[in-house]
Amino acid sequence: MPTIQQLIRSKRTKIEKKTKSPALKACPQRRGVCTRVYTTTPKKPNSALRKVARVRLTSGFEVTAYIPGIGHNLQEHSVVLVRGGRVKDLPGVRYHIVRGALDAAGVKDRRQSRSKYGAKRPKA
C-alpha cells in the first residue's frame, strides 16, 4: 500500500492487457492471401494431419491459420478472411480461416453447425 507522498511522486501504472491475436490489429477479421497451404501434425497425445495455411494479412503480418471442416478448396494466392481463435493442439496457430467467405468455400454436405462452416441450408 503506497503512501500519499509516493502516489504524488508517481501515479499508479495501468496494467496493459496483452492481446491473443496481435496480427488482427483490434479488428474482428482481416483479409489475407495464402502463401502456402499444407498439413501439419498436432502435439501429443493427438495424431492427425491438420490442414493449415500461411497467410499474408492486409495488416502486414504473416500468420499461420487453421482451415476448419472436412475438405477445402484453398491453394496458393487464394484470398481468405481470417478471424482469431487458436487451435489447442497446434503450437503457433492462433487464427482460423472463415469458411464460406471470399475464396474459401463452405463445407459440402454439412448438416449441423452449418453457420460455423459456411454451409447453405440443404433442400428437404
Curated annotation (Swiss-Prot):
Pfam families, A to Z: Ribosom_S12_S23
One annotated Gene Ontology cellular component of this protein: small ribosomal subunit
Species for this entry: Cyanophora paradoxa
General function of this protein: With S4 and S5 plays an important role in translational accuracy. Located at the interface of the 30S and 50S subunits.
Compartment list: Plastid, Cyanelle
Ranges for region Disordered: 105-124
Subunit structure: Part of the 30S ribosomal subunit.
Keywords associated with the record: Cyanelle, Plastid, Ribonucleoprotein, Ribosomal protein, RNA-binding, rRNA-binding
Gene designation: rps12
CDD domains: Ribosomal_S12 (cd03368)
GO BP annotation list: translation
Protein's UniProt name: Small ribosomal subunit protein uS12c
Lineage of origin: Eukaryota, Glaucocystophyceae, Cyanophoraceae, Cyanophora
UniProt biased composition (Basic residues): 113-124
Keyword RNA-binding among record annotations: yes
Gene3D superfamilies tied to this protein: Nucleic acid-binding proteins (2.40.50.140)
Similarity field: Belongs to the universal ribosomal protein uS12 family.
